Regions:
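Short, isolated positions in well-ordered beta-strands
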Residues: 276-280, 301-304
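One-carbon transfer enzymes
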Residues: 1-270, 285-305, 309-316, 321-331
Length: 331
């Protein structure tokens, strides 16, 4: 049977009541007052972060006929991971170990992983490349959940780049993890249209919803050792991590507007306003006219900065990130 827990049901309801999902790994939860009732299905571990994206897939995996045996996270992504957070609360509630693996491929981490005796690992947002020896520890391997239509937009920021590049469609891919980034055999995949007003936050929620629908099928395929379909990497695209991009880099107002939507809420674009860096949460293209908000000017028109703030609130550990040092990040 699936995990039975009023606590997790409440966490699930609260999560899906949000208008948008983030990748920022700083979520915490109130502690549960008791332990969950777990089933006796296949032993699975989960790898991810205390973010909306990861949490949604952890909660979905626990609704399958499984027996959770551990949670794995990567503590270098955010200071919150070293303390109490959503993953540590759920691990305690399930009565399973939480492995904070600084280097998932070293011997110490692999011994901890082997001790879980997992039949499979479900992974949703993890900032380390899992090597062949770690991938081979669970009997049926690792299922990775990547928010793009692989092989397009491989890499760490696929939702950002789909919006910033002006794509009309993206999707979610559930694939067998391989030692190469986002390159393993595909077990399930679904497309999601990108609307003209989608931000990274609203699009991520749509992608997760589609991924949750596909998870049972992909998980069954993983346990059945189905080979999946190899992506054609000759037609792939790989995009790098994103820093706080300056809207002055944009060639047009349309491009700048996409940069704003792509950066919200995970990694905000910025622009100088009266000589001071401001981080832009929302903006719209306009013809040249008077407005009460700051306007950036481009060859194709203006970009009205509808909502800005003084700090970025990002999770990247960058020494000169503005919310730490008061200067524009150089990433």
């Amino acid at each position: 049977m699936a995990v039975v827990s009023e606590y997790l049901d409440r966490v699930r309801r609260d999560l899906w009541a949000q208008e948008l999902f983030t990748f920022i790994p700083d979520r915490d939860l109130p502690p549960a007052s008791n332990e969950a009732t777990v089933g006796d299905g296949p032993r699975i571990a989960f790898a991810g972060f205390p973010s909306d994206y990861s949490l949604a897939f952890l909660l979905a995996a626990l609704q399958l006929e499984v027996r959770p045996c551990g949670i794995i996270t990567s503590p270098g992504a955010h200071p919150a991971i070293l303390g109490d957070n959503a993953l540590s609360r759920i691990a305690a509630h399930l009565g399973v170990p939480l492995i904070r693996a600084w280097r998932i491929n070293d011997e110490h981490a692999r011994l901890h992983l082997a001790a879980l005796d997992a039949e499979a690992v479900v992974m949703a947002s993890f900032d380390q490349i899992v090597g062949a020896r770690a991938l081979a520890i669970p009997r049926h391997g690792w299922l990775n959940i990547h928010p793009s239509l692989l092989p397009l937009f491989r890499g760490p920021e696929p939702v950002y780049w789909a919006i910033a590049d002006g794509a009309f469609e993206t999707g979610i891919t559930l694939h067998r993890a391989a030692p190469k980034v986002d390159a393993g055999p595909i077990l399930a995949q679904g497309a999601v249209a990108i609307q003209p007003d989608d931000s990274a936050g609203t699009l991520t929620k749509k992608l997760v919803s589609r991924g949750v629908e596909l998870l049972p099928r992909a998980f069954d395929a993983l346990l059945a050792d189905e080979p999946g379909t190899m992506p054609d990497l000759s037609h792939s695209s790989y995009r790098t991590s994103v820093g706080h991009r300056s809207l002055e880099e944009a060639a047009t107002a349309a491009e700048a507007e996409r940069m704003v939507r792509a950066g919200f809420p995970n990694m905000l674009a910025w622009a100088p306003v009266d000589g001071v860096p401001r981080y832009v949460c929302s903006a719209k293209t306009i013809a040249d006219r008077e407005t009460r908000h700051p306007v950036l000017h481009y060859p194709d028109g203006g970009l009205e900065l509808v909502e800005t703030r003084a700090t970025c609130g990002c999770h990247h550990d960058v020494a000169d990130c503005p919310h730490r040092e008061g200067a524009v990040a150089s990433v």
